[in-house]
Amino acid sequence: MTTLSATSATPELRLGLCCLNTVLRSMKPPVFASRSCIQATLLNKGYDYVRQLARQNIADIHTMMRWNYEHGIYVFRLSSDIFPHITNPVVDRTIYTLDDFVDELAELGEVARRYNQRISFHPAQFNVLGTPNPKALQQTIYELHIHATILDMMGCDSDSTMVIHGGGIYGDKEATMKRWCRNYRRLPAHIRNRLVLENCEKAFSLEDCLKISEEINIPIVLDNHHYDCYKLLHPKDIAAQTSIEDYIPRVLETWRRRGIRPEFHLSEQGCGRIGHHSDYISQIPEYYKEIPSKYGMSVDIMIEAKMKEQAILQLRSQLPMSSF
């Protein structure tokens, strides 16, 4: 399959789409990749039904990636709900597995390469490597195994990562961070090789994440909104008050060490409680825009806004034409 060129020899900044395209979702029939069902429907209709939903999801990802390419979007986070209930403990894992989709995932990987899509995942926040609960840890590892295996079966390169948060602190942040690192080291290589860690607004600051990275050499995703929210919620955490600009080179180094193209997240406060995302984003911060020229590294910025691709297209005027 021919690859369509969309890369640049000079450092660049690209904007990434998260999971859903609002234009395609509103079509009739809708195009989206998170068809699912409740557990009762799974038990009533059986595994062939959820396999059919999964194949519809995969087929629509083809359309979504083509749309991305045609509109200059080359960074794409996939939904974690492509395969309904595949990590549900009630599922018979000898009957319903990713092996049912070997050909479909191989073809999906070819399509991703054709349209120059950097593929990633952001497994849900119930994935907690620092948990003291053995059962929760076992389920987390299985969830991460499924995500990593999808990327492997697609033939994705090392730039296709899985972003997770630190999780809870369980009454003792230092002990949890040590446990997090210990559990990370015990992960199978195919999971470790794709896992990256993002700061959050409640438990793990950017400084906390960088400490973990120093211990286990995991790339760190800087989320500007989580960073701002953490500062508001933890005014007594002196380290958290450090300027975000001062963190940029330290974060970039975590990616440089691993040879992976950096990923950052961009969002703004919306209506509601602290941490809610806005529909659109007013501007790309200068500390993001200057990364390619200042540090000589290409970078991808995931746009976490409710209006998805429309928010990306609106931000285009703030970037040089070479970025898309």
Language-model features, listed with the residues they occupy:
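Alpha/beta catalytic barrel-like cores
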Residues: 1-118, 127-141, 145-156, 186, ...
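Glycine-rich, often proline-containing surface loops adjacent to acidic residues and nearby aromatics
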Residues: 118-127, 159-165
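Conserved, mostly hydrophobic/aromatic
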Residues: 122, 223, 301
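Eukaryote-skewed repeat-based solenoidal scaffolds used as protein-protein interaction platforms
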Residues: 144-216, 225
